[in-house]
Amino acid sequence: PSPSRRSRSRSRSRSKSPKRSPAKKARKTPKKRRATGGAKKPSTLSMIVAAIQAMKNRKGSSVQAIRKYILANNKGINTSRLGSAMKLAFAKGLKSGVLVRPKTSAGASGATGSFRVGKAPSSPKKKAKKAKSPKKKSSKKSSNKSNN
């Protein structure tokens, strides 16, 4: 038999398979969710801020020093993912104002150069509104003038 020809030993009639049972209805009780494993780890941005504050460097802390501090002081961190997580955290911190670049690394971009903790974004204090005294209802004078 040539390899290009199909084998004809199969039956050409298409017999229907036995009827399937109708689809199972949704469960009445919802599935139980897995319990979360203990306390959540701090965000990468909060770890970066803590590292910069602990180093107390006036001119800002380098990315390498921040990474070294985070790995030394935080257990259970995936070292292979820390670099990309730090890049995202630096971008988020710069955008929100939590982190700023010192003048020495103003031209740097991405996760390079030095970073400092920015000044806390001071929310403008809203002036307390004075309680308005309820206005007296003015009584409408009915005009008794007749229209001529």
From Swiss-Prot:
Residues 1-44, 97-148 are annotated as: Disordered. GO terms for biological process: cell differentiation; chromosome condensation; nucleosome assembly; spermatogenesis. Sperm. GO terms for molecular function: DNA binding; structural constituent of chromatin. Residues 40-119 form the H15 domain. Its main location: nucleus. This is Sperm-specific protein PHI-2B.
